[in-house]
């Protein structure tokens, strides 16, 4: 497996050639709207620390010479609270918005951003979606002002079902997901993908549960074991995966997990030494990508006593600063035009592209498996002595999925 690694310094030198420092020293505020309290608060706080940590890194050297400042808003995982936070942010003159936890929230923000920009010409805002993966956001509900940096569910499930196709031991699957758009889409795209690639696999059960409300998953585990499932497919994240895994361990489920978010706060600790070789994740990276990424990951842990697992944050700062350099402006209208269709090199994930047709980032994806740290994959997640070890890489031309987006662009 070969990873393409480039430093921010390289990007800086490249952009200097374009006379990119027109905005040097200008402060660019980014409103971070995510849950900072409640059961899913630990995930939101991890994301906030990631944005703040890499703001400091990029403030030292970025091709536009701007200074990034992150302003946090606790949305309590509520669409209504998120819209209040968005209003507060725009009232403060903040014109860049980011959010990632909960597609229900992201959908509300997209609609609100569209309305704001229609009603307030000259005060446009951009939504930098770092983790909400409902495919509709870059298909039927696509927006010129929305840019998604995580791979959407259709992309992730295309990779995951391709991987599962070649695992003959997987014969009976139970789907357990959160009862909102993301969970619905995980189930939908799994069924579509596996029926094409492994029609012999049986779906022996399916359940949905309230987002961020269940504290005891033992009844779900009992149902899964009774179904005869040898594998679970879940898009759960945060406490909903952490507590689910805990219940599986306590309930004696010894089958495979196919997940999106095993790396996310709390789940590594819940897994501990269990699950070796049978808990899989699809994502845009892993714990030892090489080069500068390894250095940053270790520094992040030493400074914050936390794991960094959201590489999308780095790609946001990379593309945003390059777009500001290219447009010689921090005006969202000019920056959006520069972002749309941008191709560049990620610090950790090779060639990436902000696809012009729908603003979905095109990037490589990896299948990883829970296993013991070793010399090559030495990063201990949540100090468990375990890590996510890469077993398969899908280049961006493989992970890419088509779009039906008919984007309305500014005149």
Question: Over which residues does each language-model region extend?
Answer:
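Periplasmic-binding protein-like
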Residues: 89-103, 120-130, 172-177, 228-238, ...
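Extracytoplasmic "Venus flytrap"
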Residues: 27-52, 73-80, 101-102, 176-185, ...
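Beta-alpha junction/loop-to-helix N-cap segments that form part of ligand/metal-binding clefts
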Residues: 27, 42-46, 61-137, 149, ...
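Extracellular/periplasmic periplasmic-binding protein-like sensory domains
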Residues: 143, 245-317, 324-330, 383-410
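Signal peptide-proximal N-terminal region
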Residues: 24-25, 48-70, 195-200
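Solvent-exposed, acidic/polar segments of extracytosolic/periplasmic ligand-binding ectodomains
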Residues: 26-28, 343, 347-411
């Amino acid at each position: 497996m070969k990873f393409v690694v480039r430093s921010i310094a390289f990007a800086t030198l490249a952009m200097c050639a374009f006379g990119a420092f027109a905005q040097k020293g200008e402060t660019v505020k980014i409103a971070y709207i995510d849950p900072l309290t409640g059961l899913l608060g630990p995930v939101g706080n991890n994301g906030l620390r990631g944005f703040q940590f890499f703001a400091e890194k990029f403030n030292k050297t970025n091709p536009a010479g701007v200074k990034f400042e992150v302003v946090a808003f606790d949305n309590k995982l509520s669409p209504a609270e998120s819209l209040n936070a968005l209003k507060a942010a725009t009232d403060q003159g903040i014109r860049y918005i980011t959010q990632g936890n909960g597609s229900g929230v992201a959908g509300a923000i997209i609609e609100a951003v569209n309305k704001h920009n229609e009603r307030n010409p000259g005060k446009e805002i951009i939504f930098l979606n770092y983790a909400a993966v409902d495919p509709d956001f870059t298909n039927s509900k696509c927006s010129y002002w929305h840019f998604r940096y995580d791979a959407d569910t259709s992309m992730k499930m295309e990779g995951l079902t391709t991987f599962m196709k070649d695992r003959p031991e997987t014969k009976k699957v139970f789907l357990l997901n959160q009862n909102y758009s993301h969970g619905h889409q995980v189930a939908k795209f799994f069924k579509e993908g596996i029926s094409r690639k492994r029609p012999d696999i049986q779906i022996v059960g399916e359940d949905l549960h309230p987002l961020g409300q269940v504290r005891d998953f033992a009844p779900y585990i009992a149902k899964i074991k009774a179904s005869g499932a040898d594998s679970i497919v879940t898009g759960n994240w945060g406490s909903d995966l952490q507590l689910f895994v805990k219940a599986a361990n306590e309930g004696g489920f010894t089958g495979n997990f196919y997940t999106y978010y095993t790396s996310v706060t709390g789940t590594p600790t819940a897994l501990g030494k269990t699950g070796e070789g049978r808990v899989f994740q699809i994502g845009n990276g892993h714990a030892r990508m090489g080069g500068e990424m390894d250095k940053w990951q270790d520094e992040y842990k030493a400074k914050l006593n936390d794991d960094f697992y959201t590489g999308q944050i780095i790609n946001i700062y990379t593309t945003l600063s390059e777009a500001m350099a290219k447009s010689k402006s921090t005006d969202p209208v000019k920056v959006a035009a520069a972002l749309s269709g941008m191709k560049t090199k990620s610090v950790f994930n090779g060639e990436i592209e902000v696809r012009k047709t729908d603003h979905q980032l095109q990037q490589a994806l990896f299948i990883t498996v829970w296993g013991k740290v070793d010399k090559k994959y030495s990063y201990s997640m949540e100090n468990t002595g375990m890590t996510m070890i890469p077993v398969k890489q899908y280049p961006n031309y493989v992970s890419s999925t088509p779009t039906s987006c008919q984007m309305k662009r500014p005149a």
